[in-house]
Amino acid sequence: MAIHFISDLHLADDTPALNQLFLDTLAAWRGRIAALYILGDLFEYWVGDDDDSPYLAAPLAAMRDFAAQTPLYVMRGNRDFLLGAGFEARSGARLLDDPTLIEAHGQRILLSHGDALCTDDAAYQQFRAMSRNPQWQQAMLAKPLAERHAIARHARAQSEMNKQQTGLTDISDVTENAVRELLAAHGWPTLIHGHTHRPAHHLHDASSRWVIQDWHGGRGGYLLLDDGGIRSLPLGN
């Protein structure tokens, strides 16, 4: 059976069409594929495993149902880096390190969210290093839930304002040097990642790099891996 890869769904309480597309997709794929890998930013933000936001109930329940029949793996992204053991218990998913190397259908596949490869964005890389620090995370998770939500909403608003002002810029894309260093360190496998919202297929010497389609406006996409190779396919209307 095929393996499917998705990323950058950015599910939130104000994205009902995307939330429903996720539920429908899990129902359609449950028990019919070998595994599903979600490579970061499943949620627009994740303020801690104790988050009791009402909109989370449906996707987490659907994930549990899915994981009961089909292996489900989730990688943390730049929006949901606080996913932890509590999320695993609530969703039935298994969290993956970034990067993770798998072997399937005769291929060596390196999985990453992709944000660590955007090395020209020095300010973001500084934030990434800080936000992955266990002490920083412990301090953040010690704050009241309402305060964490307020911080996340502010960060989301700031991010949207920056996007409107600058759009997709070169510094928000991966760099050739970072990609080549990562591929070389793992023996030049095929690389699959998300994050950049620039779905495409690239070649780096003998290695392929696939960028997964982000989800928006009730539509999305996924990568399918089977004995015939890797293909990019659409989801939604």
From Swiss-Prot:
Pathway: Glycolipid biosynthesis; lipid IV(A) biosynthesis; lipid IV(A) from (3R)-3-hydroxytetradecanoyl-[acyl-carrier-protein] and UDP-N-acetyl-alpha-D-glucosamine: step 4/6. One of its GO terms (biological process) is lipid A biosynthetic process. Mn(2+) 1 binds at residues 8, 10, 41, 197. Binds 2 Mn(2+) ions per subunit in a binuclear metal center. It is a peripheral membrane protein. It comes from Chromobacterium violaceum (strain ATCC 12472 / DSM 30191 / JCM 1249 / CCUG 213 / NBRC 12614 / NCIMB 9131 / NCTC 9757 / MK). This is UDP-2,3-diacylglucosamine hydrolase. Mn(2+) 2 binds at residues 41, 78, 113, 195. Substrate binds at residues 78-79, 121, 159, 164, 195. It catalyses: UDP-2-N,3-O-bis[(3R)-3-hydroxytetradecanoyl]-alpha-D-glucosamine + H2O = 2-N,3-O-bis[(3R)-3-hydroxytetradecanoyl]-alpha-D-glucosaminyl 1-phosphate + UMP + 2 H(+). GO terms for molecular function: manganese ion binding; UDP-2,3-diacylglucosamine hydrolase activity. Belongs to the LpxH family.
